[in-house]
Every structure is written in C-alpha cells, then in structure tokens.
Swiss-Prot record:
Signal peptide as annotated in the record: 1-21
UniProt keywords, alphabetically: Cell membrane, Disulfide bond, Glycoprotein, Kringle, Membrane, Signal, Transmembrane, Transmembrane helix
Keyword Amino-acid biosynthesis applies: no
UniProt record, GO biological process: negative regulation of phosphatidylinositol 3-kinase/protein kinase B signal transduction
Main location: membrane
Annotated localization: Cell membrane
Protein name, UniProt field: Phosphoinositide-3-kinase-interacting protein 1
Role noted for this protein: Negative regulator of hepatic phosphatidylinositol 3-kinase (PI3K) activity.
Post-translational modification: N- and O-glycosylated. O-glycosylated with core 1 or possibly core 8 glycans. N-glycan heterogeneity at Asn-66: dHex1Hex5HexNAc4 (major) and dHex1Hex6HexNAc5 (minor).
Membrane topology: Single-pass type I membrane protein
Gene3D superfamilies: Plasminogen Kringle 4 (2.40.20.10)
Length: 263
C-alpha cells in the first residue's frame, strides 16, 4: 500500500512539473502558444507593441508589453497576433501562423534562440523608418509621450503573470489529479480494512463452531468407548443329579419290607 502511495505521488509531481515547465508557452482560449514568436508569417516581423500602439488610435487598451512577440491582448478568437508594417508605413494587425506550442518545449526552445537574440539587439534602421514621424501626428504625439509611462508598469505585470499563471485548464488538471489520488488512497484503505475485518470475523466464527462441536461430541464419546461396552450376562444353572449306589454287604437292613426281623 505504501508503494502505491509513493508511485501516485511521483506521478502527480511529474505532471505538475510538466505543467510548470512550459515557461516558453502561454495559454490563450484553451490553447498553448509559443511565447517567443516574433514573426506572424514567413518574411514578416512583428513590431514593438509600445511603438506600434503609440501611433494608432484604435489600439487595445491593455497592451501586450514592451516586446515584439505575438500576443492576444484583445482576446481575438483567431488567436495571437502582432503589428506589422503596412504598405503606407502604418502598423496593421496580422494574425500569427504556426504558433502552436510543441509537445516538448525543451526541443522547441533552441530553434528560436537566434530570433530572440536578434530581437533583443534592438530595431534596425529599416524598422525605424517604418513608424510614422512624431511631427506628422501632433495630437497623437502628446498622447504617445504619456501613454507608455502608464502602460509599462501594467504591461510588465501582465507579462509576469503570464509566465507564472498556468491558466484555468492547468488548475483544473491539478485539482483533478489530487482528487483522483485521494480517492484511490481512500479506496485502498477501505478495501484493506474491509478484507481484514472479514477475515477476523471468519476466524472468530470458525472457533465458535469448533467449540460447539466439542460440546456436542463430548457426551457421545463415553458411549463409543470400547472399554465401556455393556456385555449381556448369561445365567448358568447347575442341576444336581443323584447317582444310584450299589448296596454292599453289611449295609442291608436287618428288617425286611414287612418289618419282620430276619425275614
């Protein structure tokens, strides 16, 4: 029973570790997406969220942070997206393709390390020319000067929560595993207790039955003992018979039958 508990505990820890270990991915609408995707499609590159939103009036209120990765701040049902440079140089929304997180995140992370390094080096000269100049939009430039200061703290907090939060599905799976483990342990304990009690009861009943049988068979043993068998007595009658004796001389009577002497 202890071995079963240890195995169940190790399995639950492995599942939880696998869920926590998906640091290179994030949850969105029940799906797991790569966290370091910087290209929505081949040949395109995502723009920095703060720089792109500063030049758009219809940008989502809750930004995705100070980075150039695919995110879904407005909860688009199509999935994560990012801003790319349009034909007129104005940032436009573009859904990200091939963003599903693989089964093993440890194998997928090395493939994108080069892209992360390129994005961390800073925007090149071509990317700087894509954004609209500040003097072209005087009314928006003032808002752009104030909005990043307020939005950075909020977006950094959201980004930190994305890395630590497992999502609703992760919590549901964890709670379900704990409930299953507890139910299995309780079932093992109840089954063992029931079987042990049943065995003890059978042993007690068997002893009681043996005692009753001894009480019943003890008086009969005296009658079945061969030393105590009753033997029928036979009466032997002895008859005494008188044998005839021959008369000897000197024994004849002097008187005859008639009673006369000398006759």
């Amino acid at each position: 029973m202890l071995l079963a508990w240890v195995q169940a505990f190790l399995v639950s820890n492995m599942l939880l570790a696998e869920a926590y270990g998906s640091g290179g991915c994030f949850w969105d609408n029940g799906h797991l997406y790569r966290e370091d995707q910087t290209s929505p499609a081949p040949g395109l590159r995502c723009l920095n969220w703060l720089d792109a939103q500063s030049g758009l009036a219809s940008a989502p209120v809750s930004g995705a942070g100070n980075h150039s990765y695919c995110r879904n701040p407005d909860e688009d049902p199509r999935g994560p997206w990012c801003y790319v440079s349009g034909e007129a140089g104005v940032p436009e929304k573009r859904p990200c393709e091939d963003l599903r997180c693989p089964e093993t995140t440890s194998q997928a992370l090395p493939a994108f390390t080069t892209e992360i390094q390129e994005a961390s080096e800073g925007p090149g000269a071509d990317e700087v020319q894509v954004f609209a100049p500040a003097n072209a939009l005087p009314a928006r430039s003032e808002a752009a000067a104030v909005q990043p200061v307020i939005g950075i703290s909020q977006r950094v907090r959201m980004n930190s929560k994305e890395k630590k939060d497992l999502g609703t599905l992760g919590y549901v799976l964890g709670i379900t595993m704990m409930v299953i483990i507890i139910a299995i342990g309780a079932g093992i304990i109840l089954g063992y207790s029931y079987k042990r009690g049943k065995d003890l009861k059978e042993q007690h009943d068997q002893k009681v039955c043996e005692r009753e049988m001894q009480r019943i068979t003890l008086p009969l043993s005296a009658f079945t003992n061969p030393t105590c068998e009753i033997v029928d007595e036979k009466t032997v009658v002895v008859h005494t018979s008188q044998t005839p004796v021959d008369p000897q001389e000197g024994t004849t009577p002097l008187m005859g039958q008639a009673g006369t002497p000398g006759a």
